Swiss-Prot record:
InterPro entries: Aldolase_TIM, BATS_dom, Biotin_synth/BioAB, Biotin_synthase, Elp3/MiaA/NifB-like_rSAM, rSAM. Belongs to the radical SAM superfamily. Biotin synthase family. Its cofactor is [4Fe-4S] cluster; [2Fe-2S] cluster. Homodimer. Pathway: Cofactor biosynthesis; biotin biosynthesis; biotin from 7,8-diaminononanoate: step 2/2. Keywords: 2Fe-2S, 4Fe-4S, Biotin biosynthesis, Iron, Iron-sulfur, Metal-binding, S-adenosyl-L-methionine, Transferase. [4Fe-4S] cluster binds at residues 65, 69, 72. This is Biotin synthase. Residues 47-278 form the Radical SAM core domain. The gene is bioB. SUPFAM superfamilies: Radical SAM enzymes.
Length: 361
C-alpha cells in the first residue's frame, strides 16, 4: 500500500505551502470547491495513477484502554461507552480475518490492539506468530497498530514479517491536549521515529471533526508531512455514545472534501487513505474522496463499528474508473474481482444509515 513519501514527483507537481493551504482550506462551496477538487484529482492522477489500494483491519484486542482519548469508546475511563471488551485473539483467528480481507480486495491488513502498548510477552508473541503466518499463508502486506511501542519490540515485529507500522498523530499539536491528556504528542513522535529508524513503512494520520479549527487541520497536515510518512489515513469523527465527543457536531461533507484536497496538494507523494467515518460524514458523496485526491480506503469493518459490505466499496472504486492495486509481496493475490456482499460478510451491529446528500456536481 505504501511506497515512499520521498518519491520523485512528475514535472510541474510541487507541494503547496502552508500559507496557500490555510487559504484553500476555506474553499468549501461553489466554484472554489469544484476547482480545488479538480486540482487535487489532477495531482493524484499524475503521481499515483488510477489505482486505489484497500486496507483491512482486525480489532485483535478490544477495550479497557487506560488512555483518555476523547473520541474512543475503548477507553476504560468512559463508563457510558459500549465497545466490546476481550483479550488478544489467537494468531489463527487473525490469519483467518486477513484471508477474508484479502478475498475482499485488501492489499494491506493491520493488526490493531487497544491499550497504551502491548505490555505482555504473550501478546507480543501472538502478534509475531500471526505476522509469520501472514507472510507465509497470504499475499497481504502486514501492518500493525499497537500503540506506543518501543524500538526493541518493533524490531522483533519487523523480524517476524511486519512491513508497515501505523500510529496516528490524531490531530494538531496545538489541539492535542483537548483530545488526550494521558500521553503526549512527543511520545507519539518517538514511536513513529523509532519505526522509521528500523526501515518500516509509516502510516500516520488522524481524525477530523474533533473540535479543531480549519487552520489546525493544516497544522496537523504539516506535522504529518514533516515526518515523511508513506501513508496518511484520514478519519472523520463518528461520535461514539458515552465518549466526551459524543455530542460534537459533524463537520460538513464539503469541509471533509476540502481538507482531503488540501492534504493531497500539501503531500502529493503520500498515499492518502480515507478510513473511519466516511459513511456517516459523506453519505452519498463517498465516491468523491478520489476526486479530492485520496488513493486508498478501508474495506470491511472498523474497530468498533460496521463498515460497508466489501462489494459496495469495490463497486464504488470501479464506478470511478479506478482499479484495485495488488500487494507488493510477490505472491498470488486471493482477490478474484468479486468482493463479498452483505450476505457473505460477518458484519457487526448495524450503524445508523448514512444520511442522503446531494451530489456536488
Amino acid at each position: 500500500m505504501c511506497e515512499t513519501a520521498s518519491r520523485t514527483l512528475p514535472p510541474g507537481i510541487e507541494p503547496i505551502s502552508g500559507d496557500e493551504a490555510r487559504r484553500l482550506i476555506h474553499h468549501t462551496s461553489g466554484p472554489e470547491l469544484e476547482a480545488l477538487l479538480d486540482r487535487a484529482e489532477a495531482v493524484r492522477r499524475a503521481v499515483h495513477g488510477d489505482e486505489v489500494a484497500l486496507c483491512g483491519i482486525t480489532n485483535a484486542k478490544s477495550g479497557r484502554c487506560p488512555e483518555d482519548c476523547g473520541f474512543c469508546s475503548q477507553s476504560a475511563r468512559f463508563e457510558g461507552a459500549d465497545a466490546p471488551v476481550y483479550p488478544m485473539i489467537g494468531a489463527g483467528e487473525i490469519v483467518e480475518q486477513a484471508r477474508k480481507a484479502e478475498r475482499a480486495g485488501a492489499r494491506e491488513f493491520s493488526i490493531v490492539a487497544s491499550g497504551t502498548r502491548l505490555s505482555r510477552e504473550q501478546e507480543l508473541a501472538t502478534v509475531e506468530d500471526a505476522l509469520r503466518r501472514l507472510r507465509a499463508e497470504t499475499a497481504v502486506e502486514p501492518c500493525a497498530s499497537l500503540g506506543l511501542m518501543r524500538e526493541p519490540e518493533l524490531r522483533r515485529l519487523k523480524d517476524a514479517g511486519l512491513m508497515h507500522y501505523h500510529h496516528n498523530l490524531e490531530t494538531a499539536r496545538s489541539h492535542f491536549e483537548n483530545v488526550c491528556t494521558t500521553h503526549t504528542f512527543d511520545e507519539q513522535l518517538e514511536t513513529i521515529r523509532a519505526a522509521k529508524g528500523l526501515g518500516l513503512k509509516l502510516c500516520s494520520g488522524g481524525i477530523l471533526g474533533m473540535g479543531e479549527t480549519p487552520e489546525q487541520r493544516v497544522e496537523f497536515a504539516e506535522e504529518v508531512r514533516d515526518l515523511g510518512v508513506d501513508c496518511v489515513p484520514v478519519n472523520f469523527l463518528n461520535p461514539r455514545a458515552g465518549t466526551p465527543m459524543e455530542h460534537l457536531k459533524a463537520i460538513t461533507p464539503e469541509e471533509c472534501l476540502a481538507a482531503l484536497a488540501v492534504f493531497r496538494l500539501m503531500m502529493p507523494a503520500a498515499h492518502i487513505f480515507v478510513m473511519g467515518g466516511r459513511e456517516v460524514n459523506l453519505g452519498d458523496r463517498q465516491h468523491l474522496i478520489f476526486r479530492a485526491g485520496a488513493n486508498g480506503t478501508m474495506v470491511g469493518n472498523y474497530l468498533t463499528s460496521a463498515g460497508r459490505a466489501p462489494d459496495l466499496t469495490v463497486g464504488m472504486v470501479e464506478r470511478q474508473g479506478l482499479t484495485l492495486r495488488p500487494p507488493d509481496t510477490g505472491k498470488a493475490w486471493a482477490f478474484d474481482g468479486h468482493a463479498p456482499s452483505d450476505a457473505d460478510w460477518n458484519r457487526k451491529a448495524a450503524e445508523p444509515r448514512p444520511r442522503a446528500l446531494p451530489v456536488v456536481r
